[in-house]
Every structure is written in structure tokens, then in C-alpha cells.
């Protein structure tokens, strides 16, 4: 009988299996897709490294780099080209750079704020006056939009918070929980009153050495390299079953899992590392309230469209893509394109000389229907909007479209309270564990951390006495 069954072979499930194997506990992964890695998928097209899902991870969160180092891939880690780290926002038909010194939507430098064309004078004045704001701690949760509007006004929500968070979460700031999405900002506001003063104070305490690290990191061969390394490290210690779990039931000693191939598995410990809505469908017979809570987590759908061009054919302003990492498109601009990254500017090694790759994003909570459109319709839509927004008409040499239905969890207002109740229903000694992007962070480091924590809880119970 397998001691541990892990439902889901994405980065959360793989991390759980890796740390269990390192501690001497075998496990079985159930994965319905024909590959491991979940939304992490790297392709090589005409010499270009194309990420169908996430392209990097935040340097500030250590769990990903810690795992990469353990796997012997530290020499494969590269940082983003922060020298060109400028992001543009479309406003009134133009691409306007985000002002220098912006920490998400918090200004930290006066001159760039005064001279930016992205915000009007009323917003600039309000941002300046925000420095005088006194602490006003609030009980309970509120939306990101309410929080940012109270500090900086509605325009800051429309042209900073909304496009930035749409690019990260595919979500709506009027629905997202500020306590879950921007917890550090809530702490700083409670302590200092002014977000700007709080960010500046936190930066001063951290010291200058932290600024030397690039904002984003990735692997030379793409993030698929991480999936391959984990799979190689656990080979022989972990069984991967290419099937779908249909239901989980309590058994006399642990759990029974019914599989879609007609078989059953028994386990002492189960890690639900799939999407929360899939977990909800599995757990109704184990814990009805937990299943109900998991079912309340909304998910956004997204699509990435990678377009490859010959640089000689590129007819944008000045014959090259706009300087910087890419651009964001606020909902107020009434376009379907959410964002676009110039891959070669962010990670130069991923695009050979003479090539240009645009990685475009569509979907989100406001436009999930775009995933149902044909590849031809999507390609035409992206080409039309790139021409309108970035001003070029070059025909792509290749197009790669990736659809991710219901893949990104949304931490809506009240998420901290719901999460606390989920955790109460999954105590460390209860045999049932949750991991994934639906709980305490959506990024790769967050998922790795939660997988490691699930493994540590299990190892505390099942670790062989000889280890």
C-alpha cells in the first residue's frame, strides 16, 4: 500500500513528492495530463525559448532557488535584464512608461511621479499628500481597489492597480482581497499610515544589498528544466500514475481513492495538490464543509500567444519593439489584450539575434470566452491589437497559442477567513493536506514552499526511524 498519494503533478505536487523522497518516504502521484509540470511548459521554436505558462519566479521568495540549488541547477539560473526594466501602460491610445521608482502601485520618487504622463495632477497631488497620512488600522478585509483608492484615488486603481494585478492574477481589483494579495502593504499602512513612507522605511531597513538581485529569475533552458530535474530526482522513488482521481473516501485506516481507470488506491496520507475546484469534487465524501470551501475559490482562465518575428521585418516605432519589458492594457482602454512581454528584452538569452518574440496575454475574469475562439480568430485578434497598441504590422514567422482554463486562483475578499477554516479542517495529523496556488500564494516559489510544508508535516508522522 502506498503511504502517500499526491493528487496532481504540477509544481506543488512534484515539490511534495521530492521532499518526501528526500526524507525517505515514497509516494504516488496521480496526474491526468500526459506530462508533469502543470502550467509550467517550455518549448523551443526556431531557436527561441517559449514559455507557455509562467516565465520566471520572484527572486525575493527563496523557496524556488533553494530547490533549484538542491537539484544542482544553480549554475543554470539567470536573472532578468533589469537594466531595461521599463513597463509601459496604454493610456489614451499611447504607450506611457510606468514612472521610475514605483513599487507596484506605490510611488517612492518625486520627480518621476511629477513628470509622468500616466497620471493626472489631481492624482499626483493626492499621492504627495498621502505622505502625511496617519495610521488607521482596519479590522477585517477589503478589496485591493478600496485600499488603493483610499490612499491614492480612483485613477491609481484604473491605471496602476488594475493592469498590474490583471497581469499577475487575471483578476479584478474590486474583488481581490488586499489582505491576501498585498499583505505587506496592509502591514505598512497599519504601521506608518502612508504606504509611501512605509515602503521607503522598509527599503532602508533592508539595506542596499538586496537591490543587487534581479527582480526575476529563471533557468537557462526554461522553467521546464526545473520540472525535468525534479522528475529525474524522484525517479525510482515515486510512482506516477497517468490517471484521474474520481473520488476520495475515508477508509478504516486512512483513505481510498477511486481512479478513472477503474482501480482503487489506499493511502495513509493524501495531498490534494490540484486546483481547488477539482479538490472540491473529490472531497465531498470526506469532509462536506471542506469541499464546499474549496468550491468557493474562483479561478480565472488565461491564454498566452507567442509570436515570433524576424527583426528585419519588424515595423514598430523606430523599427524595433518599444524599449522595456513590455506593456499592460488597462480595462478602461477597452481592448482584449491584457499584456504583452518582449521576451528578448526581459531575458535576452531566450531569443537569438535577429529575432523578436512578443508574448501576449488574454483572458482573465473579464474575458474567459476568448479561450473558446479558434486559433485563427485569436491570431487575427492579437495581430490587430498589436498593430493598434504597439504600431507594427509585421507578419509573425510562428505563432504558439496556449490555453489555461480555470488555472489561476482568485483570492477574493474574505479569503483569509476561508483559508483559516480550510486549515482547521486539515490539521497536520488528520492525513489530508492541501497544496497549490489556491491558498497562500500563486507564484512558483509559493507552490514549492507549500509542497515542502505538506511533505514536512507528513514526514513528522511517517519518517522511517532509520532516517
What residue ranges belong to the model's regions?
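N-terminal Rossmann-like FAD-binding beta1-loop-alpha1 element of flavoenzymes
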Residues: 2-29, 459
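Conserved Rossmann-like nucleotide-cofactor binding loop
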Residues: 12, 35, 277
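Glycine-rich FAD pyrophosphate-binding loop
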Residues: 21-45
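Mid-domain catalytic core of redox enzymes
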Residues: 23, 243-358, 362-372, 376, ...
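Dinucleotide-binding Rossmann-like beta1-alpha1 core, especially the glycine-rich loop
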Residues: 46-135
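Active-site/ligand-binding neighborhood in enzyme catalytic cores
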Residues: 86, 106, 110, 123-248, ...
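Conserved flavin/dinucleotide-binding core of flavoenzymes
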Residues: 99-101, 320-323, 336-467
Amino acid at each position: 500500500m502506498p503511504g502517500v498519494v499526491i493528487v496532481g503533478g504540477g509544481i506543488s505536487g512534484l515539490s511534495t513528492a521530492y521532499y518526501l523522497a528526500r526524507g525517505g518516504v515514497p509516494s504516488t502521484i496521480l496526474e491526468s495530463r500526459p506530462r508533469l509540470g502543470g502550467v509550467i511548459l517550455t518549448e523551443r521554436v526556431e531557436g527561441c525559448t517559449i514559455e507557455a505558462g509562467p516565465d520566471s519566479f520572484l527572486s525575493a521568495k527563496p523557496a524556488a532557488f533553494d530547490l533549484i540549488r538542491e537539484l544542482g541547477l544553480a549554475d543554470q539560473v539567470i536573472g532578468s535584464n533589469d537594466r531595461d526594466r521599463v513597463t509601459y501602460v496604454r493610456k489614451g491610445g499611447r504607450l506611457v512608461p510606468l514612472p521610475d521608482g514605483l513599487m507596484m502601485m506605490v510611488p517612492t520618487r518625486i520627480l518621476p511621479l511629477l513628470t509622468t504622463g500616466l497620471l493626472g495632477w489631481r492624482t499626483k497631488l493626492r499621492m504627495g499628500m498621502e505622505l502625511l497620512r496617519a495610521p488607521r488600522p482596519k479590522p477585517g478585509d477589503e478589496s485591493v481597489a478600496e485600499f488603493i483608492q483610499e490612499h491614492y484615488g480612483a485613477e491609481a486603481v484604473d491605471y496602476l492597480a488594475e493592469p498590474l494585478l490583471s497581469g499577475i492574477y487575471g483578476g479584478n481589483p474590486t474583488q481581490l482581497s488586499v489582505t491576501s494579495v498585498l499583505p505587506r502593504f496592509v502591514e505598512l499602512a497599519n504601521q506608518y499610515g502612508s504606504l509611501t513612507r512605509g515602503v521607503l522605511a522598509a527599503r532602508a531597513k533592508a539595506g542596499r544589498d538586496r537591490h543587487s538581485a534581479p527582480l526575476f529569475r529563471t533557468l537557462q533552458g526554461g522553467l521546464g528544466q526545473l520540472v525535468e530535474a525534479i522528475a529525474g530526482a524522484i525517479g525510482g522513488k515515486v510512482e506516477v500514475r497517468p490517471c484521474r482521481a474520481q473520488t476520495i473516501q475515508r477508509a478504516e485506516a486512512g483513505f481510498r481513492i477511486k481512479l478513472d481507470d477503474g482501480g482503487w488506491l489506499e493511502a495513509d496520507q493524501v495531498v490534494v495538490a490540484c486546483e481547488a475546484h477539482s479538490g472540491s469534487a473529490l472531497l465531498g465524501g470526506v469532509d462536506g464543509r471542506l469541499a464546499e470551501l474549496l468550491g468557493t475559490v474562483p479561478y480565472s482562465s488565461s491564454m498566452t500567444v507567442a509570436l515570433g518575428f524576424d527583426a528585419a521585418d519588424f515595423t514598430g516605432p523606430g523599427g524595433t519593439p518599444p524599449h522595456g519589458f513590455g506593456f499592460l492594457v488597462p480595462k478602461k482602454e477597452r481592448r482584449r489584450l491584457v499584456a504583452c512581454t518582449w521576451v528578448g528584452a526581459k531575458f535576452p538569452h531566450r531569443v537569438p539575434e535577429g529575432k523578436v518574440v512578443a508574448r501576449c496575454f488574454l483572458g482573465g475574469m473579464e474575458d474567459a470566452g476568448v479561450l473558446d475562439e479558434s486559433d485563427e480568430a485569436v491570431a487575427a485578434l492579437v495581430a490587430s491589437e498589436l498593430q493598434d497598441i504597439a504600431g507594427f504590422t509585421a507578419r509573425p514567422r510562428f505563432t504558439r497559442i496556449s490555453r489555461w482554463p480555470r488555472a489561476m486562483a482568485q483570492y477574493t475578499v474574505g479569503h483569509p477567513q476561508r483559508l483559516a477554516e480550510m486549515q482547521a479542517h486539515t490539521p497536520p495529523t488528520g492525513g489530508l493536506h492541501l497544496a497549490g496556488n489556491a491558498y497562500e500564494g500563486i507564484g512558483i516559489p509559493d507552490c514549492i514552499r507549500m509542497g515542502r510544508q505538506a511533505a514536512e508535516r507528513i514526514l513528522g508522522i511517517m519518517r522511517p526511524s532509520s532516517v
